[in-house]
Amino acid sequence: MPGFKDQAHQEENTGQPDRSLSFHAIACSGEFKEQLAHSVWEDKTPLLLAGEEGSGKHFIARRLAAAILCHQPDRSEGACGQCASCRMLQTGSHLDLVEIAPPDDKSSIPVASVRSQVAGTLQIYPQLSPNRVYVIEALKADTLKEQGQNALLKPLEEHPGFVRFIILTEDADRLLSTIRSRSRMIRIGRRSPDQIRRILEETGRDDQTAGLALRYADGLPGQALAMAQDANFRLLRDKAFTLFSGLPRSTRTDCLTAGLAFFKEERKELTLLLRVFESFLRDLLLLQNGMDPAGLVNVDLADDLGGMRRQAAGADPARAAELVRQTAGALASNANYDHTVARMLLGLRAFMGGHPVPEQVFRTKESFH
């Protein structure tokens, strides 16, 4: 599934200024917008935007950069959307915006890139705007390795007044303490359903697709947009449910053949598949506790999920969901793919089918290798 970089919010052609680069385009609370404005005008310390994948870091960083580069910014709304700087940024690039990210064929930013693109250009005056902005990706543990972070320390500490830094990360604790101490961190939390709905409305998707994306988004705008724009998402979800709903009646051989084959075929969608499986289990747990089906993530599958609940009275969806989360963590730590997925499928079969499960086999409260 494509990552979330920047989904431009389109304004109606009313003759009004283009607000797609302003803080207005960010679906968030007023308090959060005040934080962003403060980081632009009042506190010019290097900014560290921390938020999980899909939280909108790139989108927000671009609006912050636009405000810093703008010739006529508004102190509460950010970029004007009309000046030469804003018009250049709307084309997709800008002479005074330096974006540092891993090359397409690599997962890490080479330390040479940090030295040449940051330290090597630090003293060059801006060409169009009053400032120059460096947006640096340090998303994953290996995106900006220790040597690259060390090369960034002096520029963060000593730079001309026209230079501003924005660093993006999913986990600030993975960064060197010296990077964190030189930065001001803003944490990007999950959005409310209304805020996600506003973002989805601007994609022009049909209500059914947008509704499903909203329920699966879990407060993450990037997740919602990726799902709403992926024509295969509903098909993948339905194929996953066919496998999931058959697990209680399946054999061990089924799990190790057809079940494992499905996960190998869809390996690129693993993160999404695990979220989908967890959503099925969440819904089953709600039904098991007598909750209103209208509150299900997969509300369109309510009848099928209800049938599963009735057929396996001894099912333990809570323990099954813990196994799915544990599997995600193990795979993120590079556990063997086939072994880990097979173990999960066998465990789900047992937990969802109400079969006896030896405690020593599936210790869902502990990690495994």
Question: How does the language model describe each region?
Answer:
Residues 134-137, 152, 163-170:
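Structural recognition of the conserved hydrophobic beta-strand(s) that form the central parallel beta-sheet
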